[in-house]
């Protein structure tokens, strides 16, 4: 039995979960998420708990058992509390600013980079060297944060670039002179 898969997902007050065939819809104070799962997984809602069971111990079913439970738990967490990723910008002249719905990044290129977040994702710029990505879908928040980071990944010599706030950049030593 999967250690993660056999744990029930506790549904907090104010969150409703509906299961139709293999489609799970989670509604909460922050919004609504819908996702289709593998039809072999049995998803049951009993009171304020949701359980995921697999039909047998075949390898294909074992691999998606814990994943299905984790995805549903993230959906419940997202509509209840939401998710956020913080990015830090380091480097001389590197900065971000918000203009209306989009953010403009000056990252040492000959042109500024403009990024408009997708529907359901909110991007804040509290200081010109910090970006906060918020949303109800953990997957989409992580994707947008990774996309913004990819515009200028931290380089190993001086550490300049966009990094996650909890990321540790491994530094390299420069060339040794004669």
From Swiss-Prot:
SUPFAM superfamilies noted in UniProt: Ribosomal protein L6
GO BP of this protein: cytoplasmic translation
Molecular function as annotated in GO: rRNA binding; structural constituent of ribosome
Any one of the GO CC terms: cytosolic large ribosomal subunit
Superkingdom assignment: Bacteria
InterPro entries: Ribosomal_uL6-like, Ribosomal_uL6-like_a/b-dom_sf, Ribosomal_uL6_a/b-dom, Ribosomal_uL6_bac-type, Ribosomal_uL6_CS
Keywords noted in UniProt: Ribonucleoprotein, Ribosomal protein, RNA-binding, rRNA-binding
One Pfam family, short name: Ribosomal_L6
HAMAP family attached to this UniProt entry: Ribosomal_uL6_B
PANTHER family referenced in this protein's UniProt entry, alphabetically: 60S/50S RIBOSOMAL PROTEIN L6/L9, LARGE RIBOSOMAL SUBUNIT PROTEIN UL6M
NCBIfam families listed in its UniProt record: L6_bact (TIGR03654)
Function in brief: This protein binds to the 23S rRNA, and is important in its secondary structure. It is located near the subunit interface in the base of the L7/L12 stalk, and near the tRNA binding site of the peptidyltransferase center.
Subunit structure: Part of the 50S ribosomal subunit.
Record-stated family: Belongs to the universal ribosomal protein uL6 family.
Protein name: Large ribosomal subunit protein uL6
Source species taxonomy: Bacteria, Bacillati, Bacillota, Bacilli, Bacillales
């Amino acid at each position: 039995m999967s250690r993660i898969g056999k744990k029930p997902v506790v549904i907090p007050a104010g969150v409703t979960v509906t299961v139709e065939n293999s489609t799970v819809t989670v509604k909460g104070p922050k919004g609504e998420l819908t996702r289709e799962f593998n039809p072999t997984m049995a998803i049951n809602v009993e009171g304020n708990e949701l359980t995921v069971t697999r039909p047998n111990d075949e390898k294909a079913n074992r691999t998606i058992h814990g994943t299905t439970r984790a995805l549903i738990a993230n959906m419940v967490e997202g509509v209840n509390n939401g998710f956020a990723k913080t990015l830090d910008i380091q480097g001389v002249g590197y900065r971000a600013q918000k203009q209306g719905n989009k953010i403009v990044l000056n990252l040492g290129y000959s042109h500024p980079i403009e990024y408009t977040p997708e529907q359901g994702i909110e991007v804040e710029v509290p200081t010109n060297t910090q970006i906060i990505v918020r949303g109800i879908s953990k997957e989409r928040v992580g994707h947008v944060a990774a996309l913004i980071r990819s515009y200028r990944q931290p380089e190993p010599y001086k550490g300049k670039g966009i990094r996650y706030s909890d990321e540790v950049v491994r530094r390299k030593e420069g060339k040794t002179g004669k």
